[in-house]
């Protein structure tokens, strides 16, 4: 793919979205592209930078709104964004960056723990040149898992946690529990 475009990596928790994002950014680095990654600053589960659930770390700018980094990223040609569902301006930002010739790679949940869409990610799909939906392993029956299930009783959408608060589950296990 030449020129600006958007790559969207979606799926449930524990499906390897952040790992795939890092893999793609590293490939562009090997190909001599100037790359930057951005993560949601309220996600501080493991420390600074972008972290995978298996504790791999990658340097990243940390913000709550993508428009806050517009000046800092002008010299970069590849922009990786983790936890895209939490950025309120993800659609406008990605469209602007791709239109300016930048490669934008977004990793995001496609649905909430209630299996409802993150509308900003849903709105990004028709603007993306590439969309990949990953699956995880069901933490109950070990089959393919397409959903994230919260273990607690909280009802707020934005509660950031790992396997202490969420499980990846298949359709049957989601419904049965």
UniProtKB/Swiss-Prot annotation:
Phosphorylates thymidine and thymidine analogs, such as azidothymidine (AZT). Part of the salvage pathway for pyrimidine deoxyribonucleotide synthesis. The keyword Metal-binding applies. Zn(2+) binds at residues 138, 141, 170, 173. This is Thymidine kinase. Substrate binds at residues 113, 157-161. Its EC number is 2.7.1.21. It comes from the Viruses. It catalyses: thymidine + ATP = dTMP + ADP + H(+). InterPro entries: P-loop_NTPase (IPR027417), Thymidine_kinase (IPR001267), Thymidine_kinase_CS (IPR020633). The gene is OPG101. Keywords: ATP-binding, Disulfide bond, DNA synthesis, Kinase, Metal-binding, Nucleotide-binding, Transferase, Zinc. It is an enzyme of class 2 (transferase). The active site is at residue 83. It comes from Monkeypox virus. GO terms for molecular function: ATP binding; metal ion binding; thymidine kinase activity. It holds the Pfam family TK. PROSITE patterns: TK_CELLULAR_TYPE (PS00603). Belongs to the thymidine kinase family. Homotetramer. Two molecules of substrate bind to each enzyme tetramer. One of its GO terms (biological process) is DNA biosynthetic process. ATP binds at residues 11-18. SUPFAM superfamilies: Glucocorticoid receptor-like (DNA-binding domain), P-loop containing nucleoside triphosphate hydrolases.
């Amino acid at each position: 793919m030449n020129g600006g475009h958007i790559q969207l990596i979606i799926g449930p928790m524990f499906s390897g979205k952040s790992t795939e994002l890092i893999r793609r950014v590293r490939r562009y680095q090997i190909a001599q592209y100037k790359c930057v990654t951005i993560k949601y600053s309220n996600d501080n589960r493991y420390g600074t930078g972008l972290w995978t659930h298996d504790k791999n770390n990658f340097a990243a700018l940390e913000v709550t709104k993508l428009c806050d980094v517009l000046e800092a990223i002008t010299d970069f040609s590849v922009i990786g964004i983790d936890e895209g569902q939490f950025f309120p301006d993800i659609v406008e930002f990605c469209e602007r960056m791709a239109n300016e010739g930048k490669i934008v790679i977004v990793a995001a949940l496609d649905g909430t723990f209630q299996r409802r869409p993150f509308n900003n990610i849903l709105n990004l799909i028709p603007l993306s040149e590439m969309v990949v939906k990953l699956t995880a392993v069901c933490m109950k029956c070990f089959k393919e898992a397409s959903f994230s299930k919260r273990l607690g009783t909280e009802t707020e959408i934005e509660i950031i946690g790992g396997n202490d608060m969420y499980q990846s589950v298949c359709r049957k296990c989601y419904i049965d529990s």
